[in-house]
Amino acid sequence: MTTHFLYIEPNTSIEEVKLLFEAHLLSALPVCEGNTFIGVLRKEAVDEEDKETTVADYQYALERFFVPLTATWDTVIEAFASYHTDMLPVINETQQFIGYYYLGDFIQQLTKTPFIQEAGRILILEKSAHNYSFTETSKIVEGNGGKVLGIYLSNRTEDNVHITLKLA
């Protein structure tokens, strides 16, 4: 999480907002009053707008998405996908802006995990959605001299699951 306090306030000019979008290559910026989170302003909401206006003139365009300070990595990934954004504000239980997750930084951190870093082979298994076990799958791999570097469900339907394994 970036604890750099990059946010805009209601009195910030749209001209300054456009410069911030350009300088930081973000698709959205958090809007705060003091440290209190108000919402998120997307770049496309102000792309063609008059530079003489302020963020307060775009209250109608503010969206209210964020992740709590206690969010787990899977919640953060889901939020990035759900909100189609490259920036997720992080707020605490009193609605105070703490920082934000930047999608690029988050992906970079994921690439440092052994699942991505270690050399190995990817194997995708299709199993019954009602009869699969990570433990059983791992035991079969390890019982045959393999080493499981990572395992996750990459797809799920009513009848089947795809289990993606990275093997050493």
Where do the model's predicted regions map?
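Bateman/CBS regulatory modules and CBS-like beta-alpha motifs in cytosolic regions of diverse proteins
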Residues: 1-20, 31-32, 37-42, 51-79, ...
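Signal for well-folded cores of large energy- and translation-related assemblies
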Residues: 22, 81, 111, 141-142
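Long, contiguous binding/interaction regions
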Residues: 22-23, 103-119, 136, 168
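Short acidic/polar active-site loop segments enriched in Thr and Asp
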Residues: 27, 86, 147
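Histidine- and aromatic-rich ligand-binding microenvironments
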Residues: 30, 45-46, 105-106
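Short low-complexity, flexible loop/linker segments enriched in glycine and/or proline
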Residues: 45-46, 58-59, 163-167
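Regulatory loop-to-helix N-cap segments in sensory/regulatory domains
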Residues: 48-49, 110
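A conserved regulatory-domain signal marking ACT and ACT-like small-molecule sensing domains
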Residues: 119-168
